[in-house]
Amino acid sequence: MSIAFNHTIVAARDKRESAEFLTELFDLPAPTSFGPFMVVTLDHGASLDYADVAESDEIRPQHYAFLVSEDEFDAIYGKISARGLPHWADPGASRPGQINTRDGGRGVYFRDPAGHAMEILTRPYGSGS
């Protein structure tokens, strides 16, 4: 049996702003409109489908982790730094401005415009030394 992740819905105050934030930061194709969503397509066909949430509704921050190459990490982290985006080496945000080196890779956490915890990492946790 072959099971693959296809899509998830990501709550946002401004779906276009949040989707474009990610595509610009990750150098992905521009988001596309599909029904009420702004769709960010990732490799292997998976997508993040951004949906607007009313101001009166709470957005519960979620965590989204993206496995990237070393070169992609350098490019994305360069944009994070150039934009002055707050970032951390850990999910608890206790190591601001730092990168983690877990399992022989690199990882960093930052927030998107809707407040979701985004993470880029070069090696899956538990995969190395």
Task: Pin down the residues of each PLM region.
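Structured loop/turn residues at beta-strand edges in well-structured enzyme cores
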Residues: 1-3, 59, 113
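N-terminal beta-strand motif that seeds the catalytic metal site of vicinal oxygen chelate
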Residues: 1-16, 63-64, 68, 123-129
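Conserved beta-strand and immediately adjacent loop positions that scaffold enzyme active sites
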Residues: 7, 37, 107
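Amphipathic alpha-helical segments
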Residues: 14-29
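Vicinal oxygen chelate
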Residues: 16, 65-113, 117, 125
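Conserved short beta-strand elements that form part of the metal-binding/catalytic scaffold
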Residues: 28-62, 66-70, 103, 111, ...
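Residue-level "edge-of-site" marker
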Residues: 35-36, 93, 128
